[in-house]
């Protein structure tokens, strides 16, 4: 099966909200703690080895990377790689910059149609993960969580991580959050959950295609 995400290429890098590209195509943002495997997951989803780069120093990257998706002449969407968060040794000024950049982008970017939130399956729903949800959830747009590195868990541990994370996400619905909050297991190494993630992301980028597939055929 050919995936739209496999037609991805670097587009631009920005460090301030004023530099965000004036595009009209839908965007999907990828967020997660430093060392949650975000860059690796993006590369696997896009079937490329070096599309998204992970800094050798956790927490060093402070900018937003854009990747265009679709035909090079007429891209149909953008993937947006947000800075990793949660590394303790990052200076306070850098943390403040990240917080402003991430919270403002998530809350105000009209092109943004959904958030892919990476959580280490061994340590899901940290305080900072919850903060990301709370910044974005008021928009009513969907959040899909990838519980990364699930290959490091036993089968029972994976089941428990999935169940407990879904329970934590359901609590936001009880608080009145309108957008969909979903979760799945994911392993870039073992390619666990890859097809499921592909299908969900592409349904966000190409809802008209998904709608057409779901419509009954006229007799």
From Swiss-Prot:
<keyword id="KW-0460">Magnesium</keyword>
<feature type="binding site">
    <location>
        <begin position="32"/>
        <end position="39"/>
    </location>
    <ligand>
        <name>GTP</name>
    </ligand>
</feature>
<feature type="binding site">
    <location>
        <position position="61"/>
    </location>
    <ligand>
        <name>Mg(2+)</name>
    </ligand>
</feature>
<dbReference type="GO" id="GO:0005829">
    <property type="term" value="C:cytosol"/>
</dbReference>
<keyword id="KW-0547">Nucleotide-binding</keyword>
<keyword id="KW-0131">Cell cycle</keyword>
<dbReference type="InterPro" id="IPR006073">
    <property type="entry name" value="GTP-bd"/>
</dbReference>
<keyword id="KW-0342">GTP-binding</keyword>
<keyword id="KW-0479">Metal-binding</keyword>
<feature type="binding site">
    <location>
        <begin position="81"/>
        <end position="84"/>
    </location>
    <ligand>
        <name>GTP</name>
    </ligand>
</feature>
<dbReference type="InterPro" id="IPR030393">
    <property type="entry name" value="G_ENGB_dom"/>
</dbReference>
<feature type="domain" description="EngB-type G">
    <location>
        <begin position="24"/>
        <end position="207"/>
    </location>
</feature>
<dbReference type="GO" id="GO:0000917">
    <property type="term" value="P:division septum assembly"/>
</dbReference>
<keyword id="KW-0132">Cell division</keyword>
<dbReference type="GO" id="GO:0005525">
    <property type="term" value="F:GTP binding"/>
</dbReference>
<keyword id="KW-0717">Septation</keyword>
<feature type="binding site">
    <location>
        <begin position="186"/>
        <end position="188"/>
    </location>
    <ligand>
        <name>GTP</name>
    </ligand>
</feature>
<comment type="similarity">
    <text>Belongs to the TRAFAC class TrmE-Era-EngA-EngB-Septin-like GTPase superfamily. EngB GTPase family.</text>
</comment>
<feature type="binding site">
    <location>
        <begin position="148"/>
        <end position="151"/>
    </location>
    <ligand>
        <name>GTP</name>
    </ligand>
</feature>
<dbReference type="Pfam" id="PF01926">
    <property type="entry name" value="MMR_HSR1"/>
</dbReference>
<feature type="binding site">
    <location>
        <position position="39"/>
    </location>
    <ligand>
        <name>Mg(2+)</name>
    </ligand>
</feature>
<dbReference type="GO" id="GO:0046872">
    <property type="term" value="F:metal ion binding"/>
</dbReference>
<dbReference type="InterPro" id="IPR019987">
    <property type="entry name" value="GTP-bd_ribosome_bio_YsxC"/>
</dbReference>
<dbReference type="InterPro" id="IPR027417">
    <property type="entry name" value="P-loop_NTPase"/>
</dbReference>
<comment type="function">
    <text>Necessary for normal cell division and for the maintenance of normal septation.</text>
</comment>
<feature type="binding site">
    <location>
        <begin position="59"/>
        <end position="63"/>
    </location>
    <ligand>
        <name>GTP</name>
    </ligand>
</feature>
<protein>
    <recommendedName>
        <fullName>Probable GTP-binding protein EngB</fullName>
    </recommendedName>
</protein>
């Amino acid at each position: 099966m050919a995936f739209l995400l496999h037609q991805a290429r670097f587009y631009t890098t920005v460090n301030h909200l004023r530099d965000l590209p004036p595009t009209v195509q839908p965007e999907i943002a990828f967020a997660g703690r430093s060392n949650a495997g975000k860059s690796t997951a993006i590369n696997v989803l896009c079937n490329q080895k070096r599309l998204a780069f992970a800094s050798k120093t956790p927490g060093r990257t402070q900018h937003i990377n854009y990747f265009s998706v679709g035909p090079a002449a007429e891209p149909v969407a953008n993937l947006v790689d947000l800075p990793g968060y949660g590394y303790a040794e990052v200076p306070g000024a850098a943390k403040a910059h990240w917080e402003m950049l991430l919270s403002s982008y998530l809350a105000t970017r009209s092109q943004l149609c959904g958030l892919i939130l990476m959580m280490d399956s061994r340590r899901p729903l940290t305080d900072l993960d919850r903060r990301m949800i709370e910044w974005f959830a008021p928009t009513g747009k969907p959040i899909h969580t990838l519980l990364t590195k699930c290959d490091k868990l036993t089968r029972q541990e994976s089941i428990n991580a999935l169940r407990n994370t879904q329970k934590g996400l359901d609590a936001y619905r009880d608080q009145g959050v309108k957008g969909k909050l979903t979760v799945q297991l994911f392993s870039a190494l073992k390619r666990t959950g890859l097809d499921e993630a592909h299908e969900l992301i592409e349904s966000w980028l190409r809802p008209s295609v998904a709608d057409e597939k779901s419509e009954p055929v006229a007799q």
